[in-house]
Amino acid sequence: MAAPGEALTPSSYITHHLTNLSTYKLGLVAEESSFWNVHIDSLFFSVLTGLIFLGVFRAVARKATAGVPGKLQCAVEMVVEFVDKNVKDTFHGRNPLIAPLALTIFCWVFLMNLMDLVPIDFLPYPAQHWLGIPYLKVVPSADVNITMAMALGVFALMIYYSIKVKGLGGFAKELALHPFNHWIMIPFNLLIEVVSLLAKPLSLGMRLFGNMFAGEVVFILCAAMLPWYLQWMGSLPWAIFHILVILIQSFVFMMLTIVYMSMAHEDNDH
């Protein structure tokens, strides 16, 4: 990495902005592939956005009034009603935790995605030159570790509720006797169902990561290839379009979570 004050080439600029601040980069672990190589910046901003979500909703809940609501209360109520409607339309089981889960996922993923609209050097530049932090990626959802961790969390809940609702035997029967209800087809059924099951968290996490990482790369390319006084010409049109991507990806992650929870609560044959 270039020292403070040293100009970066476009190639090194792009590489620098795609590098996480990790325990490996800080010399705390010996290998980059180590299990303990934590992406500190992704973890920090994911926790920060989560705390912002909790803080805003808690503040609104405490100050909620039956009279004329403020703008923030109206916005929060619109989000809650939007999520609640989608849960009622999609989830047909009985579980009071699904709506709060969907609300948390939608708002948290949205806030993490929203970090992609922060100007590329707005935080990394002062972090490097004033605080001595060599690398800083501010978009948690552009880190595959974060998106896959969330997807695996949803997957764990899916398995838990599948076994809880259907029983261990019912869950095993679902894997072994579908789509072909004959004992001789059990190996083939297991292969299909296990692959299908494992594909759910993989596609859930990689879809969000791929879209947000691609968006981040476009912003970095605009900043690397254009002089500073022309960067807005490339970044602004993409930022306007990217707002849709941010919303859509938050919605898709939430809806797939609801669908997976609904599938886990189905106590009947396909």
From Swiss-Prot:
InterPro entries: ATP_syn_F0_a_bact/chloroplast, ATP_synth_F0_asu, ATP_synth_F0_asu_AS, F0_ATP_A_sf. GO terms for cellular component: plasma membrane; proton-transporting ATP synthase complex. The chain crosses the membrane at residues 37-57, 98-118, 143-163, 208-228, 239-259. This is ATP synthase subunit a. Disulfide bonds: none annotated. It comes from the Bacteria. One of its GO terms (biological process) is proton motive force-driven plasma membrane ATP synthesis. GO terms for molecular function: proton-transporting ATP synthase activity, rotational mechanism. F-type ATPases have 2 components, CF(1) - the catalytic core - and CF(0) - the membrane proton channel. CF(1) has five subunits: alpha(3), beta(3), gamma(1), delta(1), epsilon(1). CF(0) has three main subunits: a(1), b(2) and c(9-12). The alpha and beta chains form an alternating ring which encloses part of the gamma chain. CF(1) is attached to CF(0) by a central stalk formed by the gamma and epsilon chains, while a peripheral stalk is formed by the delta and b chains. PROSITE patterns: ATPASE_A. It comes from Vibrio cholerae serotype O1 (strain ATCC 39315 / El Tor Inaba N16961). CDD domains: ATP-synt_Fo_a_6 (cd00310). It is a multi-pass membrane protein.
